[in-house]
Amino acid sequence: MRVSQRLGRFGEDVAARHLSADGAEILARNWRCRDGEIDIVARHGDTLVFCEVKTRSGADYGSGPDAVVGRKAARIRRLAVRWLAEHPHPPAIIRFDVLSVYRERQGSVRVEHRRGAF
């Protein structure tokens, strides 16, 4: 596994723990279809949350939410429609979040959770 893949897996693990600690139930991780992948699908109360996780090893790469705009956000919305088609009876509220996981040089980890990011 490449370094970038290990970093991404680390970030998704941290994000899933963050969501669970916040009271969310993780329904799927790395859900795939022919059109792509959704990092995390969770239920938080009456809300179904589709999460994109961006992991950064420093500030040099910019903010995670800034990386999920335009075509990337539209692709995630399309994937969510596919997920909903395969999983009937979703909650009435649907939300798209971006979780940014920052792994600092000194080993600390910081999570920024932007709810309703797009």
Curated annotation (Swiss-Prot):
Pfam family, one: UPF0102
Family note: Belongs to the UPF0102 family.
Source organism per UniProt: Parafrankia sp. (strain EAN1pec)
Entry-linked NCBIfam families: PRK12497.1-3 (NF009150), PRK12497.3-3 (NF009154), YraN family protein (TIGR00252)
GO molecular function, one term: nucleic acid binding
Origin: domain of life: Bacteria
UniProt name for this protein: UPF0102 protein Franean1_1156
Phylogenetic placement of the source organism: Bacteria, Bacillati, Actinomycetota, Actinomycetes, Frankiales
PANTHER family per the UniProt record, alphabetical: UPF0102 PROTEIN YRAN (PTHR34039:SF1)
InterPro entries: Restrct_endonuc-II-like (IPR011335), tRNA_endonuc-like_dom_sf (IPR011856), UPF0102_YraN-like (IPR003509)
